[in-house]
């Protein structure tokens, strides 16, 4: 009888610990989604401020540029379209999100310079810090998803082909400034989508529609 009580106590403690971890992970997921939503909204505001500062003819010219433009993050392997995103595992979506956020940590220091006379960004270090905080949160979620298993992602320590891809942008160059902002908005939209689907995957919901 005593052994049964001890066993039941161990099982109960284990369940409580697992519930606590699940609750912590859910809070982390919710926080990550909120943070990337804020970054996506900020990116949209920045590009709107930039476009508002342009002459009508400049706007028409730039609207034709970005659909044909290349972003450095295009080198990061990611799902092609909604169907593939919905079929991707939670771990895969978290890893892609991690790499996308990581790719902007350094270039983000140049972002505020692309929007003149705007209070959208404020201190450029704040944007970099927001990205670093989100990256750290996603890293914790990845470790929780691995649950003690080794990280087999071979791309974790691989830099993008052009680490300084964005560094020449944003300084007295209309096209490149627009391209920088458009790429940032595009990538934050990707991360927001991936984290939303990953969060849905975690809840075992089979209807993770976009």
Swiss-Prot record:
GO terms, biological process: animal organ development; growth hormone receptor signaling pathway; positive regulation of growth; positive regulation of receptor signaling pathway via JAK-STAT; response to nutrient levels
Q: What Pfam families does this protein's entry cite?
A: Hormone_1
A Gene Ontology molecular function term of the record: growth hormone activity
Q: Report the SS bond pairs.
A: 71-183, 200-208
Q: Which SUPFAM superfamilies match?
A: 4-helical cytokines (SSF47266)
What the entry lists under CDD domains is as follows: somatotropin_like
Enumerate the Gene3D superfamilies for this protein: 1.20.1250.10
Q: Which residues bind Zn(2+)?
A: 38, 192
* InterPro entries noted in UniProt: 4_helix_cytokine-like_core (IPR009079), Somatotropin (IPR034975), Somatotropin/Prolactin (IPR001400), Somatotropin_CS (IPR018116)
Q: Where is the signal peptide?
A: 1-23
What's this protein's family per the entry?
Answer: Belongs to the somatotropin/prolactin family.
Q: Specify the protein name.
A: Somatotropin
What organism is recorded for this protein? Cyprinus carpio
Source lineage: Eukaryota, Metazoa, Chordata, Craniata, Vertebrata
